[in-house]
């Protein structure tokens, strides 16, 4: 994950001071891309410990179309708590858009099922896309989608994915986002009898918060270690039938965790 550290250093060296929605302040660059060959290991940051339990449960929650934090809380995952209302609701965020995008005529589109069918029946299509950025429902969401749009691509029997992330918290959020979408590629590839290819991450407003600077400098002193390996223990009948226990990470030997405040 050397390229992740290189991005942190680039933001420190070249970033522009900017105000932001949270009032915290950032150093920001615009437009950056990283490519991870998933054949070479699972891209889980090793220069600090990442909470893999949260990453897996959040993705399973998205795939169920869920937008209430009850499932996450039941599994000791608190990453969405700050944005939930008193009943645990978040509005029509990621899961709703992925699984039940509303149409003007009252129908709902299951984008995940749609792209699975495309991958199986028309893998050369250039339209294998999922979008969470529904402009008609942004004002109903507790938090507008940061990782907004992703596209799948099949070549030589390998499945690749590119994500566009319009806003990226480099220190806290990005390690989660990379691992989450890498996990999704592995799951989709297994369901479609494909090998994994590349995960390509593309960032828009790519920033470090002003209260993450000390933590960032500490992380930059650490040497990346070998990437772990993802093992999926079984192949469920559906992309929606995976369970937390189906996943195992082998060989993850990270440096200690680094705590930092979340900008809300």
Curated annotation (Swiss-Prot):
NCBIfam families: PRK01827.1-3, PRK01827.1-5, thym_sym. Homodimer. Catalyzes the reductive methylation of 2'-deoxyuridine-5'-monophosphate (dUMP) to 2'-deoxythymidine-5'-monophosphate (dTMP) while utilizing 5,10-methylenetetrahydrofolate (mTHF) as the methyl donor and reductant in the reaction, yielding dihydrofolate (DHF) as a by-product. This enzymatic reaction provides an intracellular de novo source of dTMP, an essential precursor for DNA biosynthesis. One of its GO terms (biological process) is dTTP biosynthetic process. HAMAP family: Thymidy_synth_bact. It catalyses: dUMP + (6R)-5,10-methylene-5,6,7,8-tetrahydrofolate = 7,8-dihydrofolate + dTMP. It is found in: Cytoplasm. Its EC number is 2.1.1.45. InterPro entries: Thymidate_synth/dCMP_Mease (IPR045097), Thymidate_synth/dCMP_Mease_dom (IPR023451), Thymidate_synth/dCMP_Mease_sf (IPR036926), Thymidylate_synthase (IPR000398), Thymidylate_synthase_AS (IPR020940). The gene is thyA. PROSITE patterns: THYMIDYLATE_SYNTHASE. This is Thymidylate synthase. Keywords: Cytoplasm, Methyltransferase, Nucleotide biosynthesis, Transferase. GO terms for cellular component: cytosol.
